Amino acid sequence: MEEEAPRFNVLEEAFNGNGNGCANVEATQSAILKVLTRVNRFQMRVRKHIEDNYTEFLPNNTSPDIFLEESGSLNREIHDMLENLGSEGLDALDEANVKMAGNGRQLREILLGLGVSEHVLRIDELFQCVEEAKATKDYLVLLDLVGRLRAFIYGDDSVDGDAQVATPEVRRIFKALECYETIKVKYHVQAYMLQQSLQERFDRLVQLQCKSFPTSRCVTLQVSRDQTQLQDIVQALFQEPYNPARLCEFLLDNCIEPVIMRPVMADYSEEADGGTYVRLSLSYATKEPSSAHVRPNYKQVLENLRLLLHTLAGINCSVSRDQHVFGIIGDHVKDKMLKLLVDECLIPAVPESTEEYQTSTLCEDVAQLEQLLVDSFIINPEQDRALGQFVEKYETYYRNRMYRRVLETAREIIQRDLQDMVLVAPNNHSAEVANDPFLFPRCMISKSAQDFVKLMDRILRQPTDKLGDQEADPIAGVISIMLHTYINEVPKVHRKLLESIPQQAVLFHNNCMFFTHWVAQHANKGIESLAALAKTLQATGQQHFRVQVDYQSSILMGIMQEFEFESTHTLGSGPLKLVRQCLRQLELLKNVWANVLPETVYNATFCELINTFVAELIRRVFTLRDISAQMACELSDLIDVVLQRAPTLFREPNEVVQVLSWLKLQQLKAMLNASLMEITELWGDGVGPLTASYKSDEIKHLIRALFQDTDWRAKAITQIV
């Protein structure tokens, strides 16, 4: 009040000095000079205070509060003077308008200078408050003070509504002051020291340790249970300037990624260090995963992630109106975490069979994890859709996984040896099969083919209870793909053996026929392209079997190529040796085919091979132009060897009559031993038994070779028409 008395005296002198209440120009100028003098003295004291603090750095115990009070008093006095000048003095003293306007400008300049001084004083006051808050370790107050300092120094209007932010003119003059750079440096020092102090305190409350060994690593996380202190520090630390990259990198590299990628042993305790900390220890191998690497079970991965979030839950406080600590951490780790989780954990955990699919809770578990991450503010459910999209694509993942697993198993079966065989349909003999076309004949197939059929049976037995009426069967088409794979791959994988080993080709033929029969039996199971598939299977098996039959025929023909007559009078030993060699070749083939092929297929095949051999033998005989009696006898004996041994190649010897040239061979033997009359009788004027196998020219040729040129021969030849 004592300081306010002179102010009112000056005003009273200025506006009532003439005794009649009229304003006096000289009195007003005198009052302004007095105020200016007081302001100059005040600014000199403020300047010295600022220089001591921010230029000379001298000891100074003066409180800025004293200067702020005086500055406020001068501000109010000048504003009152300006108001009175505007409402009373200027209206009454028209003759002094110019001088009074100049006085007004002078007062406003004084007021601007006071504003700058007050701005600097308030900054100084905030610095002193910072020191006091540091002494009490009140970090939230410290953070607020540092924010207000920034508002005063840099003109940030959004930091604090209570901060008396200066006008643009005051800011401009303030930034031109010599002390401005020093004030900025001091502010940055205080901000850095606050950040370091908060980080050190945070590191004591949240302890992250990683110990590495030659082949393993142990990671320990300890979080203080003092929630009040912990959240105060976290709220102060996790402000906008703070960069949590180091913390996020540690969590991602040492905790999140290993938990997803490797088997991890987790040890959780809520009573660490005498109950003052929550502790989570993670131990895992660091050796690079090999081909035999076993992925951790997805349930264990999700449980370990929950433990990690639960351990760190104490730091997940709100740092602003719309942001939490886990949200800040999530911005740094969520993209890689979600990608690893889906690609390396969840997709490999998708079931590979419908039995597993029926009991799997993978979708429910993923949905629960997603909700946990949303509730923890790590992910935004509208933007971070990786887990939701996994659930949406679950059926596709399942179908692809099942297809891939089935085809991998099918390919593994295809690689197995065809020679490892097993008897099927042991009681379905040819007679029963002939009467019932739906029966598969008794034969041998590869054990791998039997396993292949078991795999297809297992696929067809897969329950589809979870599929809706409109949903496609997840196994649709896989049978067709498997069988086409078998058809295409077996000839490639076993090419050399199929070409060189007769039994391999026969087994592949039987396998294809067995698959054809299986497809026909399951015609009502929705197998894609059923008819075309059955035809392809049948044609493929027959094609490779035909190649082997033709090869065996070529062997017989190769032997018969050396069949030559040493002379016209005697047969010699060569032809008999070659005939026996052909029969021996057929007997060897019988040993590998008789119990493997279905009986009807075996009989038809051997009839064809024997016919090839017999037809060539007959052709060779008919190349002779002259056959002596001795030669005819020896040829008869040669043919008799064939007639005796060929029937033994069949399970039922009578099957030999199905050989096309068999009757012709028998009749040839008969003609070699017959007289001229007997031959003509067998011809019987073109209606005898010989006409079933021979043409007239063949009979004439044989008569000319067997008999000398006589009238009887000529007469007989004339009867052969």
From Swiss-Prot:
It holds the Pfam family Zw10_N. Keywords: Cell cycle, Cell division, Centromere, Chromosome, Cytoplasm, Cytoskeleton, Golgi apparatus, Kinetochore, Meiosis, Mitosis, Nucleus. InterPro entries: Zw10/DSL1_C_sf (IPR046362), ZW10_C (IPR048343), ZW10_C_2 (IPR055148), Zw10_middle (IPR048344), Zw10_N (IPR009361). It is found in: Cytoplasm; Nucleus; Chromosome, Centromere, Kinetochore; Cytoplasm, Cytoskeleton. The keyword Transmembrane helix does not apply. Belongs to the ZW10 family. This is Centromere/kinetochore protein zw10. It comes from Drosophila melanogaster (Fruit fly).
